[in-house]
Regions:
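Low-complexity, Ser/Thr/Pro-rich intrinsically disordered linker/stalk segments at domain junctions
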Residues: 23-148
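Sec-dependent N-terminal signal peptides of Gram-positive bacterial secreted proteins and lipoproteins
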Residues: 2-24
Length: 148
């Protein structure tokens, strides 16, 4: 009987003194670089450029968690540099906005002077519908390309 009582005592002591470890459920959602840069209305966004003859081609993408009153790109600036360090604005482009849940630019062409490295800076933007709809902005800068 003493052995049974001792075993029960040890079992109860271990049960109440061993710390429990919190468990977090694994997420099935895929992770990507864009996920870490966004929160809220915008679920992903990207920006890159390629070179052409005296022009650059912009490829940009923005996706929202649902349909938005306004989604797209604001404060679009074409910048140039001779050293990839000191950037100057060559031109601005009007905002590109529409309603919906995504907006994709595929080889959006912009003429440039040439003789420099070029890049694009813009703000990915989404605004909800409704009187008190919130908005989200994510600034982004593209890679740079040389244009003769």
């Amino acid at each position: 009987m003493n052995k049974k009582a001792l075993a029960l005592s040890v079992a109860s002591v271990l049960t109440y003194t061993v710390p429990t470890m919190p468990v977090k459920a694994a997420s099935n959602a895929p992770t990507s670089v864009s996920d870490s840069r966004t929160a809220g209305l915008i679920s992903s966004c990207s920006l890159s450029i390629s070179s052409g003859r005296k022009q650059i081609y912009i490829a940009a993408d923005i996706k929202a968690i649902e349909s938005m009153k306004s989604i797209g790109y604001k404060n679009i600036s074409i910048e140039y540099s001779s050293d990839k360090v000191n950037w100057k604005k060559e031109k601005s482009i009007d905002d590109l906005l529409k309603s919906g849940s995504s907006y994709y630019l595929n080889n959006y062409s912009v003429s440039v002077s040439g003789g420099y490295y070029y890049r694009v800076s813009l703000t990915h933007y989404a605004k909800e519908s409704g009187l008190f709809g919130s908005s989200q902005s994510v600034p982004n800068t593209s890679n740079s390309v040389w244009i003769d």
